[in-house]
Amino acid sequence: MLHITPLAAFNDNYIWVFQSQQNTGAESSGIYVVDPGDGQVVIDYLIQTGQALLGILITHHHHDHTGGIEQLIRRFGAQIAVYGPQSENIIGVNHPIVANGDISLTNAGLNAKVIQLPGHTLGHIAYLIEDVLFCGDTLFSAGCGRIFEGSAEQMYQSLSELGQLPDNTKVCCAHEYTIANLAFANRVEPNNAALIDYTKKAQALRAQNLPTLPSSIGQEKAINPFLRSDSEEICQSLSIQFQQPINNPLQSFSLLRQWKDNF
């Protein structure tokens, strides 16, 4: 079993901390962190909890996901394993990942499945550990990342691949964008009962300054327009907004992303 904790950073980032938790309930003596954009946030957590840093996982090269790597290496030593996509030439990555497959986090007793997700950036990857997905800026709750380097088709395929994961897969996104994403989702699919219910729950959480994450793949398939581009209501909304017929899910997805970029 995996124990996960989101650490808030900057305005809306989450640095995810995880460690194995044995059947007895005793946790491992150290943690991994995902996308430490701010090293001090991680250091403060380690001091507070008395944990050791076992390693770092990086999903893509953007500075708000990588900015803390060098500080953490200076503090805890160059032996710290830092995994990340080889193609993105990220300073501090000493275990470059070149393809889909498994990596063994032996010091934590865990295996991670690497999933290539081009779109937000060309080299973007996600890590699936047990039933927990660390997906960076590809999939958000009720939304998806902007397409900075890849194509709409690449992003569509990446999200489609994530949509094939089991419904109970926990989704650990890197940003607390949920409320803003839900405003758009309700605009394009206003009669989605699951979306209406989820919006109320998310608003209640944020009113208490609590994270809306992790979500789940099943939840996102029910409420996220970017995983629902074949929805009849979404296609009708797009047809009205763009004054054109919607012929296929990729076209629908591309127009959704275009609309959201200017929403």
UniProtKB/Swiss-Prot annotation:
Reactions the enzyme catalyzes: an S-(2-hydroxyacyl)glutathione + H2O = a 2-hydroxy carboxylate + glutathione + H(+)
Top-level taxon in the UniProt lineage: Bacteria
A GO BP entry: methylglyoxal catabolic process to D-lactate via S-lactoyl-glutathione
Cofactor note: Binds 2 Zn(2+) ions per subunit.
Named cofactor requirement(s): Zn(2+)
UniProt-listed Enzyme Commission number(s): 3.1.2.6
Record pathway: Secondary metabolite metabolism; methylglyoxal degradation; (R)-lactate from methylglyoxal: step 2/2
Assigned keywords, A-Z: Hydrolase, Metal-binding, Zinc
Ligand binding (Zn(2+) 1): H60, H62, H120, D137
Example of a GO MF term: metal ion binding
Pfam families: HAGH_C (PF16123), Lactamase_B (PF00753)
HAMAP family on file: Glyoxalase_2 (MF_01374)
Record's subunit section: Monomer.
Record's function text: Thiolesterase that catalyzes the hydrolysis of S-D-lactoyl-glutathione to form glutathione and D-lactic acid.
Protein's name in the database: Hydroxyacylglutathione hydrolase
Organism of this sequence: Shewanella pealeana (strain ATCC 700345 / ANG-SQ1)
Gene encoding the protein: gloB
